């Protein structure tokens, strides 16, 4: 049986590891159901990442064959990390489905290889997995069920998986991370710009205090004094990417003692209240606005989860 460690150490579910898994499954199919499920879960994450990347602009200052290669390698690493340990739960659901109502074969029973091959994988990629990814694109939870704008989809595609990884490392609820980025930047459509009009990638509205040694941009923003909104000039931090912005945001919350209640919050809603109590923003309704965003995101996640469950039969 292939151990999880060896499976995760392979080069992002490549053809060699698939063929090795096929051989092992032929020798002991029942014992290798879980590795097969883990492999499919890993491929699904990669397909989801690929679909998200395809939603992003293809041309840009930093777009090249090299950056696309590094991005692909980074996505492979994300897929490995996302499916390590408990993973996303998709593998467990597949194992439960495949073993439901079945008994383990006797030692002398004829061995039938599990129906899993590279050709089957390619078929999944072109059909069922792609359909699942498309159905997983978030939509607003209101009664009209209207899809989010393209900009909002791009915004979520950029931040969803990195936010979950950041949550696992920092303790900050991932729905809170996404909700705050969405609120501060208007789902990525009202981002803080640099003086030359280029994006600052500062989707969390982090100001440039005296301790900040990096580039800054000065804009007019809204602050509240005694509950009254006022327009003021303020300096904000400038980053080179969303990942850098996310990393700095997490560092800000985890290294500053006043945000301790945020990193230990049991729920995203509690984290939102802790953020306001810690003085992250001057808006007296900040926690309420964040909670509204969090509820929208959770409703989206629930829809995605139901989509996965309803379509598992199509995987095998």
From Swiss-Prot:
Localization (cell): Periplasm
Pfam families: Glucosaminidase (PF01832), Rod-binding (PF10135)
GO-annotated biological processes: bacterial-type flagellum assembly; bacterial-type flagellum-dependent cell motility; cell wall organization
Region (Catalytic): 151-316
Keywords: Bacterial flagellum biogenesis, Cell wall biogenesis/degradation, Glycosidase, Hydrolase, Periplasm
EC number: 3.2.1.-
Top-level EC class: hydrolase
Source species, domain of life: Bacteria
Predominant location: periplasm
Additional comment: Exported via the flagellum-specific export pathway.
UniProt similarity note: In the N-terminal section; belongs to the FlgJ family. In the C-terminal section; belongs to the glycosyl hydrolase 73 family.
Protein name: Peptidoglycan hydrolase FlgJ
